[in-house]
Amino acid sequence: MLYVGGVSFFALLAVFPAVALIIAFFKVVLNTGVGLEQAEALIEVVPHAARGLFQSEVERLIEAPFHKISAQSAVALIVGAYAAHRGFKAVLAGLTFIHDETDQHGFFRFNLLAFIVAICAFVLMTVVSGAVLTIRLMHETQETETLEGLGLDSEWMWAFAGLVIGLTLLYRFAMAHSKRVPWRASIGGGVGAAILLALASWACAVYVDQVVELGATYGSVGAVVVFLIWLSWNVNAVFFGGALATEIEIALHEYRRANDFAEAESEADLSLSEPRHFW
């Protein structure tokens, strides 16, 4: 729970600077409309009760003049980088604890690894949201015949694929120190975690919309509480994927060891069954 709380807190601290950076980037490189659609594509993954937090912030940033956006982006970059770095440090610490790593990284190496993972996660998030936006634009222009033929016209399929790829790489390269986690274990953990993330998002939406009325208890901060609940459930899913990858790795190791033992016994029996000649 300590790791889940740390990741959730720093994710909450980093998400608004990330939205500001995305909008500023598209304002400079492309246009405001694309930036708005990109931000809305990201907002749709959170429960409906928490979307108001982001929608009001996105509308404010879209309407703000360029010089204010530039100044806010500089501050957002500093705050977001700090929060993302600390959040991914908590993720890596939790995963290494789950994997039962005894050989810990040094201070510099651990911080560098967390920084690299944060950069890769931000790039992957931008690519996936861009793919989702592209699919939407193609649906609007009725140009999805090729993708429909290949079964690639669903935006949720691209989001799920991005989750699987990102989590698989996380478990493969960042969870173990002494050696890499096998690909089969990493992929199994990535697929399992991605499925759990989808289920957790759906269950959280049902919980906060139909089971409890958080607004009556928490008032104006109810949306923040909803977002924290959603974050904590999804972080638990990521850690469960790490545990699943670890168990698959152990099972693969035991299977290989049993096969090696059986082969050794077979060779020993074969050598004993060979006729011996005494001269």
Regions found by a protein language model. Name each.
Residues M1-W279:
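Membrane-embedded alpha-helices and immediately adjacent juxtamembrane helical segments
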